[in-house]
């Protein structure tokens, strides 16, 4: 019986492949990369960029039973995602996406529709509410508390990645639930860590490439389902508490706002009504998209500054000049980047070299379209190679080097695409940029960053499956500025 089932699935897969080829006949398609060994490359975004030398900035790859189009230049990415955004606003619905998204109620993983547009409007309005009211002072307050905790560890090796992760999780907890209690922060932090670790496992990635594998035993899939049950239990508890205590017409946080708006907000006529499940998944998106991504970018920034102490010194001089010496005092002028040009340029350079999501989540065409003269049929999966676009030698001078000064000359360098662009641009970009500027500014005002035991962290991305461009674990020593002696264990 098992053999018969395998044979049937093989026949169906072959029929689907032949049907797909028949539908593409007569089209002027991008060139196809033969074979599938490219998927085994440890640094896939750079490998995909290298293929442009022979094939140009747009080509097709064979991914399981289907072809996908890869975009490797800023020009092709913006043509698709900005100028033809409706054509490329879709999202392919893979087995893991369906499972993680609470049956298509997620914003990041949801397919393009009128209901999706209403969901986006709800989440964006809640974020804008946070920016107008409490977001800015909250980030500064929690960052100041973070620096005080770090001061207690001065002179000893600090696992800064975990500290950044807890800080960003505390910010999201407070904005979403109006609470930064340590127990809740650690609960959500551990939940997100477990979910991302499970979702990025190779067995789940293979399930999305070859969907019929879901009919076979998969321990990785079982672990993912348990992680999702834990996630939903935690979020549902918070939603239930908010519904029991909120006052109509008033909102304490983003969850209050979304719960009260979800019953009334509709998109264009005929889209249907948003459900509480959409609020549930907006909360999930805020934690998954707003904690590890920002924390990882901050960790990359610290690593680059450890390798480039001359840049760190210039940043501290800029901060002292504009804000005055000391770890507190003047607020960070994040709304006016001209006051802290080197800090803004450093953030841009870190985002260019190490976009946390180097290969953007796959898009899907909603109707037949074209890119650079090539036909792109309806339903085609399209993947923007953001890191590849940031390392394009035809656009950037010496792209592999860490050179924040490239952004100091107005108009000399294009805007980075680390947060995507078009209809699918990251809604949390304003919050992420605020956190990056405030945390780095306060950290560098309070401390000088030094390598633990004189060992510099690796700047090579960690080889792993998944979405995020993670880094090797490392430690840093924080020397309080103005301290007359070196901290314990510090090397001159």
Swiss-Prot record:
The keyword Heme applies. Heme b binds at residues 91, 120, 363, 424, 426. Its EC number is 1.14.14.16. It is a peripheral membrane protein. It comes from the Eukaryota. One of its GO terms (molecular function) is steroid binding. Keywords: Endoplasmic reticulum, Heme, Iron, Lipid-binding, Membrane, Metal-binding, Microsome, Monooxygenase, Oxidoreductase, Steroid-binding, Steroidogenesis. Its cofactor is heme b. This is Steroid 21-hydroxylase. The gene is CYP21.
